[in-house]
Amino acid sequence: MTVKEYAGELGISKRLLTDIKFGGGDLQINGEHVTVKYVLKEGDLLIVKFPEEQVSETLLAEPVPLDILYEDEHVLVINKQPYVSSIPSREHPSGSIANGIIDHYQTTGVRATVHLVTRLDRDTSGIMLVAKHRFAHSILSSAQKNGLVKRRYAAVVHGRMAQMEGTVDAPIGRHPDSIIERTVTPDGQKAVTHFYVTCANDDMTSVALQLETGRTHQIRVHMSYLGHPLCGDTLYGGTRQEIGRQALHSEHLSFIHPLTQENMRFHAPLPQDMSKLIKGENH
């Protein structure tokens, strides 16, 4: 087995190996530099030296409040509030979670940049997973692609859903008339969403959703596809009579810790606006 093959088993991506080669890192066997083509022998000690984390020059530190659920030297788990972007955009160039993370790192003396493993739309609330260095990011990104980063969402949709539980297996791609909107299309990427109803009345349904894939706007598109757009989601057919944003919350997250191999589980309670909506206090 070569160093390259073994590194892959450790979760070191090809991209990260390239960064190690050209970014100031090193691969050593028994204290001597080797290339990725080196064939490992019994008793070899492999040392991987990762390049020093480069702090982004374009991402500014801003004192954005962060609700930190967990933090160690490898990962950061955050409960994002609604109306806060994950990263800066042209429409919202500042005040993002990423800006707040940079500020948090500077305040706590951590030399790192932002490695988001999971992102949320600006109006979606709930749990986000962040890696604090490239190795953790590489492992967690691979785990996510293999369905090992589990996310469960809570949503409120318009109308009473007839089916108490089910699976939407419908490919998602860009809408031909929009750079933002997505749609179910035969030539889109595979997208699978599992759902089950938690409570309902004639006007709306509270539903729990588990993602098998992670396409942009996946839950919003799939619920609209079923004829039950999210309350507040005007992009996909919802109205804002009851709530001022799409009623979507990342409620549960579980993953295997990239370094300790511990089973990590987190829960974020519903924000006040969604809790009131479910209780019928918003209308």
From Swiss-Prot:
Catalytic residues identified in the record: 121
Pfam families given in the database record: PseudoU_synth_2
GO molecular function term, any single one: catalytic activity, acting on RNA
InterPro entries according to UniProt: PsdUridine_synth_cat_dom_sf, PsdUridine_synth_RluA-like_CS, PsdUridine_synth_RluC/D, PsdUridine_synth_RsuA/RluA, RluA_PseudoU_synthase
UniProt record, GO biological process: enzyme-directed rRNA pseudouridine synthesis
Domain of life: Bacteria
Key words, A-Z: Isomerase
Its EC number(s): 5.4.99.-
Catalytic activity: a uridine in RNA = a pseudouridine in RNA
NCBIfam families listed in its UniProt record: rluA_subfam
Family the entry assigns: Belongs to the pseudouridine synthase RluA family.
Name assigned to this protein: Uncharacterized RNA pseudouridine synthase YjbO
Organism this protein belongs to: Bacillus subtilis (strain 168)
Name of the gene encoding the protein in the UniProt record: yjbO
